[in-house]
């Protein structure tokens, strides 16, 4: 796991056709990891990339296990963090299934305001599951107040 001290990162995967699919952006104050790989030791199916200069605090699995044993409040903190991650994942899945492109973009701008100027537009489009052209149209409509 890594704690983002400075910078912004993305977690993504690449499908068989070579298309990237972004699952998460993580900026200052966020934790980033492939939790499944981290906890099971299996190879990750995700890539994590810094989108700008970044400073991270890395926590190895063995250090994580030691901290969990030694400091009960640390275990409580991570339990809450993982619960919140599960809730966010469920909300994102529901959003991808039920919301329009405009609704997804508006929620993105409210949930991740720090990303708007720091993340390339094609990556934001990938995250919300729309084409670059659709995102451009949404941004234009929003800028003229429609």
Question: What are the roles of these predicted feature ranges?
Answer:
Residues 1-4, 55, 95-98:
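Localized chelating/binding microdomains
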Residues 12, 34-35, 66-67, 108, ...:
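Residues that scaffold the ATP/ADP-binding catalytic core of kinase and kinase-like folds
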Residues 3-12, 28-29:
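Glycine- and acidic-residue-biased ligand/ion/polar-headgroup-sensing regions
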Residues 22-79:
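Cyclic-nucleotide recognition modules
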Residues 63-64, 74, 78, 83-89, ...:
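Alpha-helical bundle regulatory/interaction domains
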Residues 99-146:
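Phosphate-/nucleic-acid-contacting segments
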Residues 17-20:
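Short alpha-helix-to-loop micro-motif enriched in aromatics/charged/Gly
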Residues 3, 22, 47, 85, ...:
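Residue-level recognition of specific faces of alpha-helices
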């Amino acid at each position: 796991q890594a704690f983002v001290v400075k910078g912004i990162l993305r977690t993504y995967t690449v499908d068989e056709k070579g298309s990237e699919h972004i699952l998460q952006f993580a900026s200052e104050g966020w934790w980033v990891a492939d939790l499944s790989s981290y906890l099971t030791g299996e190879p990750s199916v995700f890539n994590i990339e810094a989108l700008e200069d970044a400073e991270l605090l890395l926590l190895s699995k063995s250090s994580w296990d030691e901290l969990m044993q030694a400091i009960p409040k640390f275990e409580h903190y991570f339990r809450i963090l993982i619960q919140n991650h599960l809730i966010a994942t469920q909300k994102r899945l529901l959003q991808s299934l039920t919301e329009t492109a405009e609704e997804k973009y508006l929620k993105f701008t409210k949930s991740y305001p720090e990303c708007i100027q720091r993340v390339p537009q094609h990556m934001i489009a990938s995250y919300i599951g729309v084409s670059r052209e659709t995102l451009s149209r949404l941004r234009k409509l929003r800028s003229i107040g429609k």
